[in-house]
Amino acid sequence: MPNGGSDCCGTCWFNSENNGEQGYQGSEKKGVAICTIRNLEIPNPFWTYCANHPHKNQNKIDLPLGPVYINDGYPYSRKVWVNPPDNEEIRIKLLELLDKISNQPEFKYPSETVLIEEIIKQLTALKEKRAIDGLKRIINFDIEDYRNQMNFIIRNKSIIVGQAIESLLEITNGEFIDEVEKFINYGIEDNSTVNYYQENDNFAAIRYHLVRGLKHCENPKAKELLMTALKDPHNEVKAFANEILNNKNEC
């Protein structure tokens, strides 16, 4: 059974053993499980995952989206097993899906593999410049409603904004640093750490991804922003800023 998450190949409608339906009906079959959209044999389907699973892909998109992941050990983390294929049809679908990402609240399935995040990650890996306008649109989402959100079954869209920032910087080698520098203190504008709690910082992901994106920027402003991030109250943001700044100073 899928102790690493029920969003696995074992329950997927693209598992050849499930006859086009989602569920556990193929779990007792003795045949080889094949992913019908990737033409990929799945040796351990209940510990293998991708973004095409029905928990995330309710429209049953039958083009491979993102990589295939396998279990990476306790506590149920995942690692890439097979990278996604690349062709123009897939790129067009990714761009279409990018344009459909909205700021509307939505329920989230508790999984490391999230369709809208995989869309951005795959376009980034492809260095797909046609994604630039879509990423800029996401960066301009009004996410103020998520500042104090504590409902953990609602997706925090600030994560998507952060990923779009990092993606934009990586795809363009920092060309849009002037447009995203305003996010370096987003969520901690009052500079007060007296009542700061990391677990309540819903906008830390924005600063985190901005800092990660700065490693792709040769603009001197990148170092200035990293110096600012060294004072960030969130430990991960601060640690990444220190690591990236040290790497830049060694160059």
Give each language-model segment a name.
Residues 1-84, 92-95:
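Cysteine-centered metal-binding/redox modules
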Residues 34-38, 223-231:
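Low-complexity, intrinsically disordered Gly/Pro/Thr-rich segments
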Residues 45, 175, 221:
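Residues that form or flank phosphate/diphosphate-binding pockets in enzymes
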Residues 68-88, 96, 106-128, 137, ...:
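Structural detector for internal amphipathic alpha-helices that build alpha-solenoid repeat scaffolds
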Residues 87-91, 132, 177-181, 222-223:
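Core helices of alpha-solenoid repeat scaffolds
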Residues 94-100, 138-147, 180-193:
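Amphipathic alpha-helical segments within extended alpha-helical solenoids and repeat-rich scaffolds
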Residues 232-236:
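Short coil/turn segments at helix-helix junctions and helix-capping linkers
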